[in-house]
Structure formats: structure tokens, C-alpha cells
Amino acid sequence: MSTVAWDFAERRLGLNLDILYPNGTAYNFRVIQDYTTGTQFTIFERYRFCAKQKAPMPEPENCIPGNTSVRFRGFLGAGKDRIDYDLYTMKLTKEETGNLEGEGTFSVVRGTEYDIPLSNSFIGTYFDGETPYAQVSNGGYYNIEIGIDDPKRWFDVPDYCPKELTDLTMIPKHIPKWTWIRLPAPRLF
């Protein structure tokens, strides 16, 4: 499970992610992406380990990408509790994303003041360098709130984080390998 805070006004993202492995091992880590400085911090608080990297590009936008198509319009509920949504699809290319090729879908609740993401999926290929891996991912959004109650929780970088970029080949063995995870340079997924 993951929780996310987007602060588009300050150009930053906070992510709290749990990774569950088939052998029962679980890891939790945080990611802070700050596009004003062009940096990303990956933080394993349990180990007091932090890696500094360049923020993934392109910078996220708070809009529906131009290369999407509405595939379906639907609703949930009825009467005064009815919620209308649109389901979009888009093709992703390795040239555009840097490491993904395939088709993404996402649904957005149409609101009077805000459009709110509802779900997303991707079916295609993830490239680690030139090595391709089949990838299928799905996600859903819930408990969405407008505003960030505690920005420090999401965006404060711990004192033990390095000032210089981290050499990812030198990560200690007790730190789980997270670099294969597509950390967001997202548009809604």
C-alpha cells in the first residue's frame, strides 16, 4: 500500500510505500521529489538510510495528458450520491517515458471544483536499461483530501540524508533493492 501527497503549488511529491515480497518480508520507505531543486530522496527510516538522486523527468503536471482518449463515461451511485467519471487510455512509448512502453488507463471523477483520480492501470514493458520486463500494474485511489494537513511529515528531509548524489552501486546489502520500482514521474499513475 502507498500513500501520496502532491503539492503542485510547491512542485513536490511525498510518497510512503510498503513493498511486500512473496517470502513474507516487508519494507517501508519514503520518497520525496522536489522539482524546485530537481532532487529525489529515497528514505528507509528503519535503517537510517537515505539516497539522493535526480528527480525523474518529466515533471508531473496537474492535468490530463494531451495524448489520451476518453474510452468510457460512467457513473457510480444514484440520485444525489451519483458520481460521474471518465475512463481514459493512452499509449506510452519508451522514448517518451524513458523506461515504459505499453498502454495505460486511468479514470477520473468529474467534479464541480476538482477532477479527482479514481484508478489506474498499465500493461506493457518496463525497461531496466535495455533489458525488457513484462509489467502489469493496477492502482486505486481512496480517502482523497484537498490540502495537506502536515507538510513536514511528507516533505522534510532527515538530517542523515546526503548532500551529494548517491552512487547506487554502493548501497549496503541490508538495504532492499528498490531501484527497479518505477518511482513516479507520473501523470496519474
Swiss-Prot record:
Tree of life domain: Eukaryota
GO molecular function: calcium ion binding
GO CC annotation terms, alphabetical: cytoplasm; extracellular region; lysosome
Protein name, as recorded: Development-specific protein LVN1.2
Keywords: Developmental protein
Any one biological process term the GO annotation gives: flagellated sperm motility
Tissues where the protein occurs: Endoderm cells.
